[in-house]
Amino acid sequence: MKLAALLVACAACAHASADEGHFYTQIANDVAFGTDRWYTSGVRMAREKDGIEWGLVQDIYTPDAKNWHPGKDDRAPTARLLGSGALHQRAPELWQTIEFALGVQGPAALGHQTTSAVHHLVPAPHVDWTRQPGGRLDAQVAITRSQRVAFDFVKVHYGATLGTVTTFAHAGFELRAGDTTLSSALLRFAPTPPTSTGSDHAWSVYAGASERVMGREELISRNYDPLGPDLKYRRPLSRLAAGLSWKWRWGGLAFDLVQDAKEFNAQTAPQRFGSVSILIDF
């Protein structure tokens, strides 16, 4: 009897030690819509295991340089570079995330260097990065909760981000078919590994919407036009998102398309971008 109990305990330990971690990369870019403006690039590289995640994030913002001319108001280029740590609590009907992020906004975030390297390979209109605001500390705390309501395929997301650069509250929903344990990072506004708590082999499609109420947005302030006034951001911001994903034993892929409402009055069109997430289990 004691031997049987010991074998069961050893098997449980072996199973626990065999639990895989997850490495994922999420790349957002407006090239999916043939543009290079406003929120032009975002990259998150992260490693998650046992509900603890560590990551590196870079977001880059530029004016609509292709259509800009002197006298036209637009956002000045800038970037963020953040180290991120997150705690995930997951259950079949719940996903809660708390993120702590610390880094810089401005020249030290390497937005100019990153876009220059990319545009050596992919041509794009010239952006005058001397208009970038000076550097500042970028720190934030984000809390997001996602949970099912009424039906398995209906999920709500809500939470808030409090930071030195950007502060907002958000609430939204998504309708998802297939593997309903997945959630959209683009509607959660928090680190969201594209991992399933269901089957090792699964597919999923979703569509959803979210509303943000901005309390602070330092990413929109300086005007790209040196003679123009400072820009004022819009407080209510809506987002539409849709996507699909596949999950295999070794990892997975996810594709998303997003449309954001105008973030400032001089913006000439909604912001649209695509996102690709690549997951590797190891």
Where are these regions (language model features)?
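Transmembrane beta-barrel domains of Gram-negative outer membranes and organellar outer membranes
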Residues: 21-140, 213-229
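Outer membrane beta-barrel transmembrane domains
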Residues: 22-24, 28-33, 37, 64-69, ...
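Transmembrane beta-barrel strands of outer-membrane/channel proteins
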Residues: 23-29, 54-60, 100-106, 156-164, ...
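Residues that define the transmembrane beta-barrel architecture of outer-membrane proteins
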Residues: 37-43, 77-81, 96, 133-141, ...
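Residues on the lipid-exposed face of transmembrane beta-strands in outer-membrane beta-barrel proteins
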Residues: 43-47, 83-89, 102, 141-147, ...
